[in-house]
Amino acid sequence: MRKGNSLHRNLDTIFGNEVYSNNLTHQEFLSVRNQHLWEKLRDIPLYEAVHTWLSSLTNHTSRSYRGSILALERIGLISLKMPLQQFALLNHNIILDAIKQIPTTVVCWSEGTKQVRAACYISLTKFLNRVTSGIISIAQPSHQESNKTFYKIRDLVKTNAMNQVERVLFLEELSKINYRDWLIAQTILQGAKRVTEALSVTTDHICFENGVISFNQIKSRGVFKTTIITYPQKFMKLLQDYVGERKGLVFITKKGRGVGLKQLAGTFAKAGIKAHIPFKVTPHVLRATAVTEYKKMGCSDSDIMKITGHSSSKMIYAYDKSTIADNASKKVSLI
C-alpha cells in the first residue's frame, strides 16, 4: 500500500476560479462542484485514500484496519488500485453483507473477525463520504434480527488470565530473559495497564518518594484521562536504579529508542513457554490477569475502574473469570 498524502490536496484544489467568478445559482454551483469532484476522483487511487484515512486513526486502530483492508483485497472484495470514481459506483452495502457471509471455503474468519472487517469498511466509507461531500456513500450495517451486521458475541473477554502460581512462574522466567521487560511486565500487572500506556510512560510521571506513576490515556474523541497507580517500594527502588539520571521515556532500548511492541510480545511469549503456561502470554494477558485478581480480592468495580481507566463497570465485568457458581449465594444464606 503506497504511502501518499495528496488526497486532501487533490480534493482541496478541485474548484477553479470559474466556479466562483460566474454568476451561478446555488443549484448550478452544486452541479459544477460535483462534476469537478467526480472528474477528480478518477485520478485518485483507493490506496492513496486508504493511507490518508489510516493516518487519521489511532496507532492501534490503524494497524488493525490496515490488516483488514489488505484482507478484503486478498479475497477480491475490493482492489486498492481502483480509482475513487470506480469505488464510488460500488454497492457498499452488498460488500458489507459479503464480508459477513463469506464462506469458510474462501477464508476461515471467526464472527469476531468478520465484525472487525465490517467495522473497518464502514469507517472507510464514512471517511470518504465526508471528504467527497457525499459522492461516495456510506456502507450501512443491517439491523434485521436474523441478519444483523453487529451483535454481541460473548459477555466476557476472550483473553486468558494467569492464576497466582502461573503469574509467579512467568515473572521468574521473564527476569532471566530480559530484565527491562520484567520491569515492564510488573508495571502492566500492578496497574492493569495497556501495553501502550506502560511503554509510553515518561520519567516526569514518576514520583519515587510517594511510589506512584501517572499514566495518560487518550479516550474517544481525544479526551485525556489520567490514572495514578501506587507501586510497592521494592519495585520503585528497582525502577529508580534502572532509570538512573535519564529523562524522557522510562523503558528504552540499548540505542535509547522506545521499546517495540513486537519485541516485547516475543519476550512475553517466550517466558510463558518456559514457565509452561498453557496458553500464549501476551501483554494483554497481563492486563486481564490484573483485573481478574483485583476482582478476586473483592475490590469494587469503581475502585478497579480508577486503576484501569475503564468508563463503566460493564467493562470490568467482561474480565470476570470466576465460575458461574462463585456468586453471592455461596457466601450468604437467606433461609
From Swiss-Prot:
- Ranges for domain Core-binding (CB) come to 44-129
What domain of life? Bacteria
Q: Which UniProt keywords apply?
A: DNA integration, DNA recombination, DNA-binding, Plasmid, Viral genome integration, Virus entry into host cell
- InterPro entries per the record? CB, DNA_brk_join_enz, Integrase-like_cat_sf, Integrase_catalytic
Per its record, what are the GO molecular function terms? DNA binding
- Domain (Tyr recombinase): give its ranges: 155-332
For the biological process aspect of GO, one term held by this record is: symbiont entry into host cell
**Active site annotated at which positions?**
R194, K219, H284, R287, H310, Y319
The UniProt family comment states: Belongs to the 'phage' integrase family.
Which protein is depicted?
A: Virulence plasmid integrase pGP8-D
